[in-house]
Amino acid sequence: MSQTEEKKGIGRRVQAFGSFLSSMIMPNIGAFIAWGFIAAIFIDNGWLPNKDLATLAGPMITYLIPLLIAFSGGRLIYDLRGGIIAATATMGVIVALPDTPMLLGAMIMGPLVGWLMKKTDQLIQPRTPQGFEMLFNNFSAGILGFIMTIAGFKILAPLMKFIMHILSVAVEALVHAHLLPLVSILVEPAKIVFLNNAINHGVFTPLGADQAAKAGQSILYTIESNPGPGLGILLAYMIFGKGTAKTTSYGAGIIHFLGGIHEIYFPYVLMRPLLFIAVILGGMTGVATYQATGFGFKSPASPGSFIVYCLNAPRGEFLHMLLGVFLAALVSFVVAALIMKFTREPKQDLEAATAQMENTKGKKSSVASKLVSSDKNVNTEENASGNVSETSSSDDDPEALLDNYNTEDVDAHNYNNINHVIFACDAGMGSSAMGASMLRNKFKKAGINDITVTNTAINQLPKDAQLVITQKKLTDRAIKQTPNAIHISVDNFLNSPRYEELLNNLKKDDQA
């Protein structure tokens, strides 16, 4: 394996880890928001103080949210059974440290117990006497839950207390030294290579929850989610950009600023690498502004939309919120404008920049691909048949795997029995939902009413999936998850010629 391939492999593993963390946190964002509303509205200094209703906030962040995260983590590993025992075992960590929201402990305990439950069943079920299945299943789960609850209380809880103390001290040191804005030097570039999931959901969310529980709000929720820096970049392209980049920047600005899907501005930065300076300085400005004004959110601002920022802003601090977003956008815009005005026009176009971002991330961007409408198709496979060694090596070679499944030749498949199409992306939320909505509209206009179109995360694809649509760099993961499905790769998730080809094939099969 070459050094370049090894680096790509490491990068993909890191991104997959970030995706897994995101899959535990993102489905529970609604619970975070509900808790945030209760805390913001009913506490003593809230919008509508109510002592009785305010008592809901404590148990929700102490018990409900960690248990939901643990359940999600266990379920990702071993379905419902893994989730239930994971949530049970996490009570040990929660009860041992009742004054600290155990989000980080839940993120560890959930997948761990789910994996142990899976291995326990694999060991016990083949050896279970006939007629004793229910007894063995229930008691094996109960005994594992009992053991891991005690282990959580006695072993993991002290470890979590130490880790949370170290992280909290580090954050407090940065805050007191007025150095927290420097975190943007790492966070803003990390967003471009899709490490923001690991940073935001793995570090900022649990630490922010701890701070919010103690102080009522946390600045950590604003570090990665501020839409200002990205807006500044897109505004600069609206005014100083040329060609495709300029014309697409308007729609991208709406999707980014109001929709909260930040990845749509990443290709614009990659077109001119000097623009990394603009997003870093914009991010630092936003953090510095919020630090100076003492601003913070009570719950995660997810997605990082201006609308979410407005809804989450604490009472009496709406102007502080606006100031942080405005100044971040202003600094990012000014720096980007200077760079675009006084540096050479890049040879790289928007499509190439999108491809570079996707290659750097090790996956296709499901929303950024709206920016380009390329009709590129790979060359027809010259050698359709391969030997056994080539097939076995395809697991390590994504391109070979895609060739084996004819993922870019829509006409190569039989669609007679298709009644469900799934859009799959990394997190399974915003971008895949947009793609699914677009295809549903196409089906409706074409009179195809008997095919369901849904969206999900790659690692939650059902084993009986029939037709899966993914971005090209994600397709190899989707194939490994659902090897019996038809897989279609697209270069442009929201604007691909393959959708028309799919519609034509579905109509033909329907008429036949």
UniProtKB/Swiss-Prot annotation:
Metal-binding found in the keyword field: no
Sorted UniProt keywords: Cell membrane, Kinase, Membrane, Phosphoprotein, Phosphotransferase system, Sugar transport, Transferase, Transmembrane, Transmembrane helix, Transport
Spans within the Extracellular topological domain: 51-54, 162-170, 299-318
Major site of localization recorded for this protein: membrane
Composition bias, Polar residues: 380-392
SUPFAM superfamilies per the UniProt record, alphabetical: PTS system IIB component-like
Active site feature: 425
Residues annotated as domain PTS EIIB type-2: 419-512
Topology in the lipid bilayer: Multi-pass membrane protein
Disordered: annotated span: 355-402
The EC number(s) this enzyme carries: 2.7.1.197
GO terms, molecular function: kinase activity; protein-N(PI)-phosphohistidine-mannitol phosphotransferase system transmembrane transporter activity; protein-phosphocysteine-sugar phosphotransferase activity
Membrane side Cytoplasmic: residue ranges: 1-28, 76-139, 192-278, 341-512
One Pfam family, short name: PTS_EIIC
Reaction equations catalysed: D-mannitol(out) + N(pros)-phospho-L-histidyl-[protein] = D-mannitol 1-phosphate(in) + L-histidyl-[protein]
PANTHER family referenced in this protein's UniProt entry, alphabetically: MANNITOL PERMEASE IIC COMPONENT, PTS SYSTEM MANNITOL-SPECIFIC EIICBA COMPONENT
Domain notes: The EIIC type-2 domain forms the PTS system translocation channel and contains the specific substrate-binding site.
Its biological purpose: The phosphoenolpyruvate-dependent sugar phosphotransferase system (sugar PTS), a major carbohydrate active transport system, catalyzes the phosphorylation of incoming sugar substrates concomitantly with their translocation across the cell membrane. The enzyme II CmtAB PTS system is involved in D-mannitol transport.
Listed name of the protein: PTS system mannitol-specific EIICB component
